Amino acid sequence: MSTYPIIIGVAGGSASGKTSVAQAILQRVGADRIAHIDHDRYYKDLSHLPLEERAKFNFDHPDALDNDLLVAHLDALCAGQSVDLPTYDYATYVRLPQTERIEPRPVILVEGILIFYEPVLRRRMQIKLFVDTDADLRFIRRLRRDIVERGRSVESVIEQYLATVRPMHLEFVEPTKRYADVIFPGGGRNPIAIDMVVARIEAALQATP
């Protein structure tokens, strides 16, 4: 398989700081050179279920995500084709008709909690980063995010964390740390590690014909 574009994976637990690391890379390497994809966009549509059942769905299990579509999109971008990213509504748990078109770029950056779990995704990545953050800090960040950005109640966030987020992290996310080329401790606030990753990306871009 061609190594162009360069595919970078940023994994880690929920609210670990993956997006902060991704944004740092985007700023340093240049957003015009990176196609940025969030794995959360690929949650399966639950519109066929009653809203009450959707709210109880285990979104932290690998089966909750449409990885076939993500793989197809990655392969299309690598083939020089534009793709239409799905849009997911976290308040109603459905895939919306609106999409976001992204064009091929020299770098594809994929972030998500489970992107290292699936071998079919992992094999496509040349650089794999894992953001390692204390569980208490991740929970606080998730609580704030889900209330402010996703319209969730405190009770629903806590219930979901205890029922699925924490156990699924221990079963499916934490073990994938071993696949990482670089581990970011402390929530990704590590400028030295960012410098190393950016230097590696730039070197790979220069070496690509």
Curated annotation (Swiss-Prot):
Gene3D superfamilies: P-loop containing nucleotide triphosphate hydrolases. ATP binds at residues 12-19. Pfam families: PRK. Its EC number is 2.7.1.48. GO terms for cellular component: cytoplasm. It is found in: Cytoplasm. The keyword DNA repair does not apply. Pathway: Pyrimidine metabolism; CTP biosynthesis via salvage pathway; CTP from cytidine: step 1/3; Pyrimidine metabolism; UMP biosynthesis via salvage pathway; UMP from uridine: step 1/1. It comes from the Bacteria. GO terms for biological process: CTP salvage; UMP salvage. GO terms for molecular function: ATP binding; cytidine kinase activity; uridine kinase activity. Its main location: cytoplasm. PANTHER family: URIDINE KINASE. Belongs to the uridine kinase family. NCBIfam families: PRK05480.1, udk. This is Uridine kinase. It comes from Chloroflexus aurantiacus (strain ATCC 29366 / DSM 635 / J-10-fl).
